[in-house]
Swiss-Prot record:
Entries under InterPro entries matching the protein: Ara_Isoase_C, AraA_central, AraA_N, AraA_N_sf, Fuc/Ara_isomerase_C, Fucose_isomerase_N/cen_sf, Lara_isomerase
Family note: Belongs to the arabinose isomerase family.
Cofactor notes: Binds 1 Mn(2+) ion per subunit.
Name of the protein described by the UniProt record: L-arabinose isomerase 2
An example Gene Ontology biological process: L-arabinose catabolic process to xylulose 5-phosphate
UniProt keyword terms in alphabetical order: Arabinose catabolism, Carbohydrate metabolism, Isomerase, Manganese, Metal-binding
Organism listed in the record: Bacillus licheniformis (strain ATCC 14580 / DSM 13 / JCM 2505 / CCUG 7422 / NBRC 12200 / NCIMB 9375 / NCTC 10341 / NRRL NRS-1264 / Gibson 46)
Binding-site positions, Mn(2+): E306, E331, H348, H447
Length: 474
Protein backbone atom coordinates (compact mmCIF):
# COMPACT_ATOMS: atom_id res chain seq x y z
CA UNK A 1 0.00 0.00 0.00
CA UNK A 2 0.98 3.63 -0.51
CA UNK A 3 2.03 4.28 3.09
CA UNK A 4 1.86 7.32 5.36
CA UNK A 5 5.04 6.65 7.33
CA UNK A 6 5.31 5.47 10.92
CA UNK A 7 2.81 7.04 13.29
CA UNK A 8 2.38 7.02 17.05
CA UNK A 9 0.09 8.53 19.67
CA UNK A 10 1.09 10.21 22.89
CA UNK A 11 -0.54 9.24 26.18
CA UNK A 12 -0.81 12.18 28.56
CA UNK A 13 -2.02 11.45 32.09
CA UNK A 14 -3.43 14.27 34.19
CA UNK A 15 -2.74 14.85 37.87
CA UNK A 16 -1.29 17.63 40.06
CA UNK A 17 1.42 18.17 42.68
CA UNK A 18 -1.17 18.57 45.44
CA UNK A 19 -1.21 14.85 46.23
CA UNK A 20 2.52 14.50 46.85
CA UNK A 21 5.30 12.54 45.21
CA UNK A 22 4.25 9.16 46.60
CA UNK A 23 0.86 9.43 44.91
CA UNK A 24 2.40 10.71 41.68
CA UNK A 25 4.75 7.72 41.64
CA UNK A 26 1.72 5.42 41.78
CA UNK A 27 0.08 7.41 38.98
CA UNK A 28 3.20 6.96 36.84
CA UNK A 29 3.29 3.23 37.54
CA UNK A 30 -0.38 2.80 36.66
CA UNK A 31 0.04 4.87 33.50
CA UNK A 32 2.99 2.76 32.39
CA UNK A 33 1.11 -0.46 33.08
CA UNK A 34 -1.84 0.78 31.04
CA UNK A 35 0.42 1.87 28.19
CA UNK A 36 2.18 -1.48 28.07
CA UNK A 37 -1.06 -3.46 28.21
CA UNK A 38 -2.75 -1.42 25.51
CA UNK A 39 0.25 -1.77 23.22
CA UNK A 40 0.33 -5.52 23.83
CA UNK A 41 -3.40 -5.94 23.22
CA UNK A 42 -2.96 -6.26 19.43
CA UNK A 43 -6.08 -4.11 19.06
CA UNK A 44 -4.51 -0.68 18.63
CA UNK A 45 -3.19 -0.15 15.08
CA UNK A 46 -0.54 2.34 16.21
CA UNK A 47 1.75 2.46 19.27
CA UNK A 48 0.92 4.47 22.37
CA UNK A 49 3.84 6.39 23.92
CA UNK A 50 3.60 7.55 27.54
CA UNK A 51 4.70 11.11 28.28
CA UNK A 52 5.62 12.93 31.49
CA UNK A 53 2.74 13.44 33.89
CA UNK A 54 0.61 16.50 33.19
CA UNK A 55 0.96 18.20 36.57
CA UNK A 56 1.23 21.89 35.65
CA UNK A 57 0.48 24.29 32.81
CA UNK A 58 4.07 24.56 31.60
CA UNK A 59 4.46 20.79 31.25
CA UNK A 60 1.13 20.43 29.44
CA UNK A 61 1.90 23.30 27.07
CA UNK A 62 5.36 21.91 26.31
CA UNK A 63 3.92 18.48 25.47
CA UNK A 64 1.26 19.90 23.16
CA UNK A 65 3.75 22.12 21.34
CA UNK A 66 5.97 19.12 20.71
CA UNK A 67 3.02 17.09 19.43
CA UNK A 68 2.33 19.80 16.85
CA UNK A 69 5.78 19.83 15.27
CA UNK A 70 6.54 16.11 15.38
CA UNK A 71 5.09 14.64 12.20
CA UNK A 72 5.15 11.08 13.49
CA UNK A 73 2.76 11.97 16.34
CA UNK A 74 -0.79 11.71 15.00
CA UNK A 75 -2.68 12.69 18.12
CA UNK A 76 -3.02 12.75 21.89
CA UNK A 77 -4.92 10.49 24.29
CA UNK A 78 -5.53 11.94 27.74
CA UNK A 79 -6.61 10.25 30.96
CA UNK A 80 -7.34 11.93 34.28
CA UNK A 81 -5.99 9.56 36.94
CA UNK A 82 -6.64 12.12 39.66
CA UNK A 83 -8.23 15.52 39.69
CA UNK A 84 -6.22 17.82 37.39
CA UNK A 85 -7.30 21.49 37.54
CA UNK A 86 -8.38 22.44 34.03
CA UNK A 87 -6.95 25.94 33.99
CA UNK A 88 -3.60 24.19 33.66
CA UNK A 89 -4.82 22.67 30.39
CA UNK A 90 -6.12 25.78 28.66
CA UNK A 91 -3.07 27.06 26.81
CA UNK A 92 -1.73 23.66 25.78
CA UNK A 93 -5.14 22.48 24.60
CA UNK A 94 -5.71 25.68 22.63
CA UNK A 95 -2.33 25.26 20.94
CA UNK A 96 -2.89 21.60 20.08
CA UNK A 97 -3.46 21.21 16.33
CA UNK A 98 -3.91 17.45 16.23
CA UNK A 99 -6.77 15.15 17.23
CA UNK A 100 -7.48 14.66 20.92
CA UNK A 101 -9.16 11.72 22.65
CA UNK A 102 -10.30 11.90 26.27
CA UNK A 103 -10.28 8.40 27.73
CA UNK A 104 -12.72 8.38 30.64
CA UNK A 105 -11.58 5.33 32.57
CA UNK A 106 -9.73 4.43 35.75
CA UNK A 107 -6.96 2.01 36.59
CA UNK A 108 -9.10 -0.21 38.80
CA UNK A 109 -12.30 -1.72 37.48
CA UNK A 110 -14.21 -1.99 40.77
CA UNK A 111 -14.37 -0.12 44.05
CA UNK A 112 -12.63 -2.16 46.81
CA UNK A 113 -15.32 -1.66 49.45
CA UNK A 114 -13.63 -3.60 52.29
CA UNK A 115 -10.40 -1.55 52.07
CA UNK A 116 -11.29 1.77 50.46
CA UNK A 117 -9.99 4.81 52.34
CA UNK A 118 -9.18 8.44 51.52
CA UNK A 119 -5.74 7.54 50.18
CA UNK A 120 -7.46 5.34 47.60
CA UNK A 121 -10.02 8.06 46.88
CA UNK A 122 -7.32 10.69 46.30
CA UNK A 123 -5.39 8.41 43.98
CA UNK A 124 -8.36 7.08 41.99
CA UNK A 125 -10.68 9.98 41.28
CA UNK A 126 -11.07 9.81 37.51
CA UNK A 127 -14.79 10.56 37.81
CA UNK A 128 -13.81 13.84 39.48
CA UNK A 129 -11.03 14.67 37.04
CA UNK A 130 -13.08 13.72 33.97
CA UNK A 131 -15.71 16.35 34.66
CA UNK A 132 -13.22 19.16 35.21
CA UNK A 133 -11.30 18.21 32.07
CA UNK A 134 -14.42 17.61 30.01
CA UNK A 135 -15.69 21.07 30.86
CA UNK A 136 -12.62 22.88 29.57
CA UNK A 137 -12.59 20.91 26.31
CA UNK A 138 -16.24 21.78 25.78
CA UNK A 139 -15.57 25.42 26.67
CA UNK A 140 -12.72 25.51 24.14
CA UNK A 141 -14.93 23.82 21.49
CA UNK A 142 -12.14 21.31 20.97
CA UNK A 143 -14.25 18.69 19.13
CA UNK A 144 -12.32 16.01 20.97
CA UNK A 145 -13.41 12.39 21.02
CA UNK A 146 -14.58 10.91 24.33
CA UNK A 147 -14.34 7.17 24.97
CA UNK A 148 -15.89 5.88 28.20
CA UNK A 149 -15.39 2.52 29.88
CA UNK A 150 -12.88 0.25 31.54
CA UNK A 151 -9.65 0.36 29.57
CA UNK A 152 -9.08 -3.41 29.48
CA UNK A 153 -12.40 -4.17 27.79
CA UNK A 154 -12.16 -5.05 24.07
CA UNK A 155 -14.99 -2.71 23.07
CA UNK A 156 -13.21 0.25 24.68
CA UNK A 157 -9.92 -0.63 23.01
CA UNK A 158 -11.75 -0.99 19.68
CA UNK A 159 -13.17 2.53 20.01
CA UNK A 160 -9.66 3.85 20.64
CA UNK A 161 -8.37 1.93 17.62
CA UNK A 162 -11.07 3.35 15.36
CA UNK A 163 -10.31 6.88 16.54
CA UNK A 164 -6.60 6.32 15.88
CA UNK A 165 -7.43 5.47 12.27
CA UNK A 166 -9.43 8.69 11.95
CA UNK A 167 -6.64 10.74 13.52
CA UNK A 168 -4.02 9.35 11.13
CA UNK A 169 -6.32 10.09 8.19
CA UNK A 170 -6.92 13.62 9.48
CA UNK A 171 -3.17 14.26 9.52
CA UNK A 172 -2.78 12.67 6.09
CA UNK A 173 -5.56 14.86 4.72
CA UNK A 174 -3.12 17.77 4.70
CA UNK A 175 -0.76 15.70 2.55
CA UNK A 176 -3.34 14.67 -0.05
CA UNK A 177 -2.32 15.80 -3.54
CA UNK A 178 -4.60 15.11 -6.48
CA UNK A 179 -3.31 15.08 -10.07
CA UNK A 180 -6.10 15.75 -12.56
CA UNK A 181 -5.38 14.32 -16.00
CA UNK A 182 -7.71 16.47 -18.04
CA UNK A 183 -10.66 18.49 -16.76
CA UNK A 184 -14.05 17.55 -15.39
CA UNK A 185 -16.55 15.80 -17.63
CA UNK A 186 -18.45 18.46 -19.53
CA UNK A 187 -21.89 19.51 -18.26
CA UNK A 188 -21.74 17.42 -15.06
CA UNK A 189 -22.66 19.44 -11.97
CA UNK A 190 -21.83 17.47 -8.83
CA UNK A 191 -18.16 16.89 -9.71
CA UNK A 192 -17.41 20.63 -9.59
CA UNK A 193 -16.08 22.31 -6.47
CA UNK A 194 -14.06 25.10 -4.89
CA UNK A 195 -10.45 23.91 -4.81
CA UNK A 196 -9.27 26.82 -2.67
CA UNK A 197 -11.85 26.11 0.02
CA UNK A 198 -10.99 22.40 -0.12
CA UNK A 199 -7.34 23.22 0.54
CA UNK A 200 -8.21 25.62 3.37
CA UNK A 201 -10.69 23.29 5.06
CA UNK A 202 -9.32 19.82 4.31
CA UNK A 203 -5.72 20.43 3.26
CA UNK A 204 -6.17 18.99 -0.24
CA UNK A 205 -3.92 20.18 -3.08
CA UNK A 206 -5.46 19.75 -6.54
CA UNK A 207 -3.36 20.26 -9.69
CA UNK A 208 -4.32 20.03 -13.36
CA UNK A 209 -2.19 18.34 -16.02
CA UNK A 210 -2.84 18.08 -19.71
CA UNK A 211 -3.08 14.51 -20.93
CA UNK A 212 0.07 15.08 -22.97
CA UNK A 213 2.07 15.27 -19.74
CA UNK A 214 1.02 11.70 -18.98
CA UNK A 215 1.53 10.52 -22.57
CA UNK A 216 5.21 11.44 -22.28
CA UNK A 217 5.51 9.08 -19.31
CA UNK A 218 3.64 6.34 -21.18
CA UNK A 219 6.00 6.61 -24.14
CA UNK A 220 9.00 6.24 -21.83
CA UNK A 221 7.89 2.86 -20.44
CA UNK A 222 10.04 -0.01 -21.75
CA UNK A 223 8.90 -3.38 -23.10
CA UNK A 224 10.91 -5.07 -20.36
CA UNK A 225 8.94 -3.21 -17.68
CA UNK A 226 5.65 -4.06 -19.37
CA UNK A 227 6.48 -7.76 -19.70
CA UNK A 228 7.55 -7.98 -16.07
CA UNK A 229 4.27 -6.44 -14.90
CA UNK A 230 2.26 -8.63 -17.27
CA UNK A 231 3.83 -11.69 -15.65
CA UNK A 232 2.66 -10.37 -12.28
CA UNK A 233 -0.87 -10.13 -13.64
CA UNK A 234 -0.70 -13.80 -14.63
CA UNK A 235 0.08 -14.75 -11.03
CA UNK A 236 -2.74 -12.69 -9.53
CA UNK A 237 -5.68 -12.85 -11.92
CA UNK A 238 -7.55 -15.15 -14.24
CA UNK A 239 -7.12 -14.42 -17.94
CA UNK A 240 -10.37 -14.44 -19.94
CA UNK A 241 -9.64 -14.06 -23.66
CA UNK A 242 -13.31 -13.96 -24.67
CA UNK A 243 -13.69 -13.56 -28.43
CA UNK A 244 -10.24 -12.00 -28.87
CA UNK A 245 -7.20 -13.77 -30.16
CA UNK A 246 -4.57 -14.29 -27.49
CA UNK A 247 -2.25 -11.90 -29.34
CA UNK A 248 -4.82 -9.09 -29.53
CA UNK A 249 -5.90 -9.67 -25.94
CA UNK A 250 -2.36 -9.50 -24.59
CA UNK A 251 -1.66 -6.41 -26.65
CA UNK A 252 -4.61 -4.64 -25.05
CA UNK A 253 -3.66 -5.72 -21.54
CA UNK A 254 -0.07 -4.59 -22.05
CA UNK A 255 -1.32 -1.12 -22.97
CA UNK A 256 -2.89 -0.98 -19.50
CA UNK A 257 0.34 -2.28 -17.98
CA UNK A 258 2.20 0.61 -19.58
CA UNK A 259 -0.42 2.98 -18.16
CA UNK A 260 -0.05 1.55 -14.67
CA UNK A 261 3.71 2.04 -14.74
CA UNK A 262 3.45 5.51 -16.25
CA UNK A 263 0.73 6.84 -13.96
CA UNK A 264 2.42 5.51 -10.84
CA UNK A 265 5.73 7.02 -11.92
CA UNK A 266 4.09 10.36 -12.69
CA UNK A 267 2.29 10.43 -9.33
CA UNK A 268 5.35 9.40 -7.33
CA UNK A 269 7.61 11.90 -9.10
CA UNK A 270 5.21 14.71 -8.20
CA UNK A 271 4.32 13.53 -4.71
CA UNK A 272 0.71 12.83 -5.69
CA UNK A 273 -1.37 10.17 -3.94
CA UNK A 274 -4.67 10.57 -5.79
CA UNK A 275 -5.68 11.23 -9.38
CA UNK A 276 -8.54 11.56 -11.84
CA UNK A 277 -9.03 10.73 -15.50
CA UNK A 278 -11.70 11.74 -18.01
CA UNK A 279 -12.79 9.77 -21.07
CA UNK A 280 -13.22 13.12 -22.86
CA UNK A 281 -9.48 13.88 -22.46
CA UNK A 282 -7.60 11.01 -24.10
CA UNK A 283 -5.56 12.68 -26.85
CA UNK A 284 -2.51 10.50 -27.51
CA UNK A 285 -3.86 7.58 -25.44
CA UNK A 286 -4.86 4.27 -27.02
CA UNK A 287 -7.33 3.35 -24.27
CA UNK A 288 -9.09 4.83 -21.29
CA UNK A 289 -7.08 3.67 -18.25
CA UNK A 290 -9.03 0.83 -16.64
CA UNK A 291 -7.02 -2.10 -15.34
CA UNK A 292 -4.22 0.38 -14.64
CA UNK A 293 -6.47 2.49 -12.42
CA UNK A 294 -7.84 -0.55 -10.59
CA UNK A 295 -4.33 -1.75 -9.83
CA UNK A 296 -3.32 1.65 -8.48
CA UNK A 297 -6.41 1.91 -6.31
CA UNK A 298 -5.53 -1.47 -4.84
CA UNK A 299 -2.13 -0.02 -3.92
CA UNK A 300 -3.76 2.82 -1.97
CA UNK A 301 -3.94 5.67 -4.48
CA UNK A 302 -7.18 7.65 -4.41
CA UNK A 303 -9.16 7.84 -7.64
CA UNK A 304 -12.38 9.06 -9.19
CA UNK A 305 -13.53 9.26 -12.78
CA UNK A 306 -14.58 12.19 -14.93
CA UNK A 307 -12.25 14.65 -13.21
CA UNK A 308 -14.00 14.32 -9.85
CA UNK A 309 -11.12 15.46 -7.69
CA UNK A 310 -13.24 15.73 -4.51
CA UNK A 311 -14.11 12.05 -4.59
CA UNK A 312 -10.53 11.09 -5.52
CA UNK A 313 -9.25 12.95 -2.45
CA UNK A 314 -11.99 11.44 -0.30
CA UNK A 315 -11.05 8.00 -1.62
CA UNK A 316 -7.44 8.49 -0.58
CA UNK A 317 -8.54 9.82 2.82
CA UNK A 318 -10.74 6.81 3.54
CA UNK A 319 -8.12 4.39 2.24
CA UNK A 320 -5.73 5.76 4.84
CA UNK A 321 -8.44 5.63 7.50
CA UNK A 322 -9.32 2.01 6.66
CA UNK A 323 -5.70 1.00 6.07
CA UNK A 324 -6.88 0.22 2.53
CA UNK A 325 -9.28 -2.49 3.60
CA UNK A 326 -12.54 -2.97 1.64
CA UNK A 327 -12.73 0.69 0.64
CA UNK A 328 -13.00 2.22 -2.81
CA UNK A 329 -14.45 4.57 -5.40
CA UNK A 330 -17.97 3.71 -6.47
CA UNK A 331 -20.86 4.95 -8.61
CA UNK A 332 -24.60 4.35 -8.39
CA UNK A 333 -25.86 2.73 -11.58
CA UNK A 334 -29.07 0.69 -11.56
CA UNK A 335 -31.95 0.06 -9.15
CA UNK A 336 -33.34 -3.36 -8.31
CA UNK A 337 -37.01 -2.58 -7.58
CA UNK A 338 -38.51 -6.05 -7.12
CA UNK A 339 -40.59 -6.07 -3.94
CA UNK A 340 -38.52 -7.22 -0.98
CA UNK A 341 -35.29 -7.18 -3.00
CA UNK A 342 -34.79 -3.43 -3.36
CA UNK A 343 -31.10 -2.62 -3.77
CA UNK A 344 -28.69 -0.63 -5.94
CA UNK A 345 -26.17 -1.98 -8.43
CA UNK A 346 -22.85 -0.18 -8.10
CA UNK A 347 -20.17 -0.15 -10.77
CA UNK A 348 -18.31 2.13 -13.16
CA UNK A 349 -17.38 2.05 -16.82
CA UNK A 350 -14.09 0.34 -15.89
CA UNK A 351 -12.64 1.46 -12.59
CA UNK A 352 -14.08 -0.60 -9.73
CA UNK A 353 -11.67 -1.07 -6.82
CA UNK A 354 -10.51 -4.71 -6.41
CA UNK A 355 -10.23 -4.21 -2.64
CA UNK A 356 -14.00 -4.83 -2.75
CA UNK A 357 -13.72 -8.18 -4.58
CA UNK A 358 -15.21 -11.34 -3.10
CA UNK A 359 -13.74 -13.65 -5.75
CA UNK A 360 -10.55 -13.85 -7.79
CA UNK A 361 -10.72 -11.04 -10.37
CA UNK A 362 -10.34 -11.86 -14.02
CA UNK A 363 -8.92 -9.62 -16.72
CA UNK A 364 -11.14 -9.17 -19.74
CA UNK A 365 -11.00 -6.93 -22.81
CA UNK A 366 -14.25 -5.45 -24.04
CA UNK A 367 -15.40 -2.48 -26.13
CA UNK A 368 -16.16 0.81 -24.39
CA UNK A 369 -18.90 2.83 -26.02
CA UNK A 370 -17.46 6.19 -24.97
CA UNK A 371 -14.07 7.80 -25.41
CA UNK A 372 -13.60 6.67 -29.03
CA UNK A 373 -10.54 4.56 -28.28
CA UNK A 374 -9.41 0.94 -28.48
CA UNK A 375 -11.10 -1.75 -26.40
CA UNK A 376 -9.69 -1.42 -22.86
CA UNK A 377 -8.73 -4.16 -20.41
CA UNK A 378 -10.25 -4.21 -16.95
CA UNK A 379 -10.66 -6.42 -13.87
CA UNK A 380 -14.08 -8.02 -13.45
CA UNK A 381 -15.32 -9.49 -10.17
CA UNK A 382 -18.26 -9.65 -7.77
CA UNK A 383 -18.30 -7.41 -4.72
CA UNK A 384 -18.04 -8.77 -1.20
CA UNK A 385 -20.71 -8.72 1.50
CA UNK A 386 -20.66 -6.65 4.66
CA UNK A 387 -22.06 -3.68 6.53
CA UNK A 388 -20.48 -0.31 5.96
CA UNK A 389 -20.91 3.28 4.89
CA UNK A 390 -21.15 5.01 1.53
CA UNK A 391 -19.94 8.60 1.59
CA UNK A 392 -20.36 11.51 -0.81
CA UNK A 393 -18.98 15.05 -0.64
CA UNK A 394 -20.49 17.95 -2.56
CA UNK A 395 -19.94 21.70 -2.79
CA UNK A 396 -23.15 23.63 -2.12
CA UNK A 397 -21.73 27.04 -2.98
CA UNK A 398 -21.54 28.33 0.58
CA UNK A 399 -20.13 25.18 2.15
CA UNK A 400 -19.15 21.57 1.65
CA UNK A 401 -21.44 18.81 2.90
CA UNK A 402 -20.70 15.17 3.64
CA UNK A 403 -23.44 12.58 3.18
CA UNK A 404 -23.09 9.31 5.09
CA UNK A 405 -25.44 6.43 4.31
CA UNK A 406 -25.20 3.11 6.10
CA UNK A 407 -25.46 0.15 3.71
CA UNK A 408 -25.49 -3.63 3.74
CA UNK A 409 -23.59 -5.07 0.79
CA UNK A 410 -24.28 -8.60 -0.40
CA UNK A 411 -22.69 -10.92 -2.92
CA UNK A 412 -24.60 -11.26 -6.20
CA UNK A 413 -26.41 -14.57 -6.56
CA UNK A 414 -27.40 -14.33 -10.23
CA UNK A 415 -24.68 -14.50 -12.92
CA UNK A 416 -24.32 -11.57 -15.32
CA UNK A 417 -22.40 -13.14 -18.23
CA UNK A 418 -22.80 -10.12 -20.51
CA UNK A 419 -21.74 -7.48 -17.97
CA UNK A 420 -18.12 -6.51 -18.79
CA UNK A 421 -17.46 -4.65 -15.52
CA UNK A 422 -17.14 -5.47 -11.84
CA UNK A 423 -20.32 -5.20 -9.79
CA UNK A 424 -21.13 -4.40 -6.17
CA UNK A 425 -24.64 -4.65 -4.71
CA UNK A 426 -26.03 -3.12 -1.55
CA UNK A 427 -29.17 -2.31 0.36
CA UNK A 428 -29.41 1.18 1.84
CA UNK A 429 -30.50 1.96 5.39
CA UNK A 430 -32.98 2.42 6.93
CA UNK A 431 -34.83 1.02 3.92
CA UNK A 432 -34.78 1.55 0.17
CA UNK A 433 -37.48 4.22 -0.06
CA UNK A 434 -36.41 6.36 2.88
CA UNK A 435 -32.70 5.91 2.25
CA UNK A 436 -32.80 6.90 -1.41
CA UNK A 437 -35.21 9.75 -0.71
CA UNK A 438 -32.98 11.21 2.00
CA UNK A 439 -29.92 10.89 -0.25
CA UNK A 440 -31.62 12.75 -3.09
CA UNK A 441 -33.16 15.42 -0.88
CA UNK A 442 -29.77 16.18 0.64
CA UNK A 443 -27.96 16.38 -2.70
CA UNK A 444 -25.85 13.24 -2.50
CA UNK A 445 -23.73 12.64 -5.58
CA UNK A 446 -23.52 9.65 -7.90
CA UNK A 447 -19.79 9.33 -7.22
CA UNK A 448 -19.08 7.97 -3.77
CA UNK A 449 -16.54 6.14 -1.65
CA UNK A 450 -17.81 2.98 0.00
CA UNK A 451 -16.15 1.28 2.94
CA UNK A 452 -17.10 -2.04 4.45
CA UNK A 453 -14.45 -1.45 7.13
CA UNK A 454 -15.25 2.03 8.46
CA UNK A 455 -18.18 3.18 10.60
CA UNK A 456 -20.58 6.10 10.72
CA UNK A 457 -19.01 7.19 13.99
CA UNK A 458 -15.61 7.49 12.33
CA UNK A 459 -17.08 9.61 9.53
CA UNK A 460 -18.69 11.93 12.08
CA UNK A 461 -15.45 12.19 14.05
CA UNK A 462 -13.58 13.30 10.94
CA UNK A 463 -16.32 15.74 9.91
CA UNK A 464 -16.19 17.43 13.32
CA UNK A 465 -12.41 17.73 13.16
CA UNK A 466 -12.60 19.73 9.90
CA UNK A 467 -15.83 21.61 10.72
CA UNK A 468 -17.68 19.87 7.90
CA UNK A 469 -21.47 19.73 7.74
CA UNK A 470 -22.67 16.15 7.62
CA UNK A 471 -25.91 14.24 7.18
CA UNK A 472 -26.32 10.67 8.42
CA UNK A 473 -28.84 8.33 6.80
CA UNK A 474 -29.31 5.11 8.75
Amino acid sequence: MLTTGKKEFWFVVGSQHLYGEETLAEVRAHAQAMTDALNESAVLPYPLVLQDLAVNADKITSIMKEVNYRDEVAGVITWMHTFSPAKMWIRGTKLLQKPLLHLATQFNESIPWPTIDMDFMNLNQSAHGDREYGFINARLKKQNKVVVGYWERPEVQQQIAEWMDVAVAYNESFNIKVARFGDNMRNVAVTEGDKIEAQIQFGWTVDYFGIGDLVQYVNAVTDEEINRLFAEYADLYEFDYGTYSREDWEKSVKVQASYEIAIKRFLDDGGYNAFTTNFEDLYGMKQLPGLAVQRLMAQGYGFAGEGDWKTAALDRLLKVMSRNQSTGFMEDYTYELAAGQESILQSHMLEVDPSLASNKPKIIVSPLGIGDREDPARLVFDGKAGDGVVVSMADFGTHYKLLINEVSAFEPTVPAPNLPVARVLWEVKPNFQDGVKAWLENGGGHHTVVSLFLTTDQMITYAKLVDLEYVVIK
